[in-house]
């Protein structure tokens, strides 16, 4: 008969996968306060004997964190309390179930890597401890120990099969998480593409907004120039109207002077007529005086004729001046209306310029926001990639653990078969 495989009972044997490094991760399922852990274990094991509870507390507070170095303390406690190995294993399993399902004393659901690490560490510990207990019992009790060892091996086989089922479920959940991660990554990629399109559109609209702002500024400057020109025209028209009014006043003064000249000509003509009469009375001595009187009369008549011509021209000038004055008044009114319209247009251009500036500022903010969203989506994609890598690592670890557990199950079954044949 071939002897039992020492790798099942010797804690110094190298496991198929490294487990010691997983213990800190396994501890993440447990609360940091020992009293909380103690209360949790007592609550889960309310129907178990006190010495079993004490052994479980010893395992979770000392053995699980410290590994093989603390096996002796737990084995001593098991021996001192005469604790049944099967009852102890069942109690540890009872505590493990709510921890792995997320009903443990810590807040929130457990991380996948913590669940995997905890399951692997406990599986190794239970296998090694059961082997040590079985070996000690065999040395102490002989054939009775062999029977107990067979029962222990059967229990280990059952636990290993349950562990296989758990590993299959964990592997299924890991695969599902990987699929969900891939789907989420695809969704994030679509969102990133949409954000990039929005950013591109915002950039294009922002460029056009800058062009509109430039045009609005140019239009505003042109409107300012038009207003200044209209103001200059209005001032010029007002000045010409004032000058025309002054000219009209001067022509009226000329008209008064012409009337005076006409009066003088009439009086001179009357004096010349009187002089002619007096010269006729004076006979031959008044001939020279008569000639002078005729000359004076001729000059008076010519002066009157010139004065009448001047008066006619002055009247024409006055008519034209009045017409020009009326036209200038109308032109001044029109320039005032144009000035008012130009000022209103200037205000409108200023409002357009302010609105376009506001739109440009808003578009700059949208552009900055989309850039931040793009950065966030890139960071999220990196986080999802990291989560996917961890999920793949967990899946690989679970597969490795399942292989190791399956190999151990085969060894246990072979050991059980050999033990049955040796009886």
UniProtKB/Swiss-Prot annotation:
Question: What organism is recorded for this protein?
Answer: Halobacterium salinarum (strain ATCC 29341 / DSM 671 / R1)
Give the free-text PTM comment from the record: Methylated by CheR.
Sorted alphabetically, which InterPro entries does this protein's record hold? Answer: Chemotax_Me-accpt_rcpt, MCPsignal_dom
| Annotated transmembrane regions | none
Protein's job: Potentially involved in chemo- or phototactic signal transduction.
Report one GO cellular component: membrane
Q: Does the keyword Cytoplasm apply?
A: yes
UniProtKB keywords: Chemotaxis, Cytoplasm, Transducer
Where in the cell does this protein reside?
Answer: Cytoplasm
Q: What is this protein called?
A: Transducer protein Htr13
Q: Which Pfam families match?
A: MCPsignal (PF00015)
Gene name tied to this protein? htr13
Q: Enumerate the spans annotated as Methyl-accepting transducer domain.
A: 152-388
Gene Ontology MF term list: transmembrane signaling receptor activity
